[in-house]
Amino acid sequence: MSSATTTLVEMRPMSLWRAVAQNELAWIGLILLALVVAAAVLAPWLAPRDPLEQDIVARLQPPSAEYWLGTDSYGRDVLSRLLYGARISLFVGFVSILTAMLIGTSVGIVAGYVGGLFDQIVMGVLDVLLAFPTLLLGLMIAAMLGANLQNLIIAIAVTEIAPFARVARAPAITLREREFVEASRSYGCGPFRIMTRHILPNMISDVVVMSSLWLASAIRTEASLSFIGLGVPPPAATWGGMIREGFENILDAWWLAVFPSLAIFAVVLGLNLLGDALRDASDPRSSAR
């Protein structure tokens, strides 16, 4: 039983990625994400100018051969700021989701496996977090901590912990009564070994699927908090901050808000397409609905 279960766990991720590779929409999502990630990584070489360099003489220049995406109200090159802004948005999104995934999954597995009063207390706290809309909860936390990169990551991570914990708790409750878990207990395996070697591998694909979907939410939240002034403070280039400046000059300089908005749209679309493909591959019944 144990070897059969291990084989199933090892094969499932392979079949999951094989199914995703056959999905055309997933490839579109991967291409969009690859382009944005490549642009962020290569920003120092792709950016035509320093994103912080000001030139008041060239302020609010429309897209042209000299300034491909125009300039902002301080004469800074929009293309350069867009490329460097991708680095901040992706970094905040990935780190916050990774933090939420590690904490939330661990809490959910322990709560589901232990059960009892501990499970009730944990779920009560999670229900309180889930009662708040993601953006509102992130706004309150960011406002209390202050506007900087570290606090922004903490604020977004806290808003995403509860969903990961719920996803991990449900299979943990089911798996703790399975025969291979009972067999492990009879052989003297401790709770930590059972949770890490038997329960976690059987839910890892669900966690991966959720990570791709909630990463899009984290990037949207980062842009929203930056838009209202609770993200990375200026003069750092952030997509949300660029949209905020563009909103203030929307009648005179449409390009300031349009291009960062399109960048966010491309990333979120790519993540949603990839996440939907992962979800359909891991649960074929969802695609039949």
Which residues does each predicted region cover?
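Amphipathic alpha-helical segments that mediate coupling or scaffolding at interfaces
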Residues: 19-20, 59, 82-85, 89, ...
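Alpha-helical transmembrane segments of multi-pass membrane proteins
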Residues: 22, 36-40, 80-92, 96, 127-130, 139-143, 156-162, 213, ...
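Gly/Trp-centered helix-boundary motif
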Residues: 1-105, 109-110, 117-120, 131, ...
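Hydrophobic core positions of alpha-helical segments in small-molecule transporters
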Residues: 28-31, 92-96, 125, 138, ...
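Generic hydrophobic transmembrane alpha-helix motif, especially the helices
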Residues: 68, 72, 78, 102-103, ...
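Glycine-rich helix-loop "coupling/hinge" segments at transmembrane-helix boundaries
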Residues: 141-144, 156-157, 171-172, 213, ...
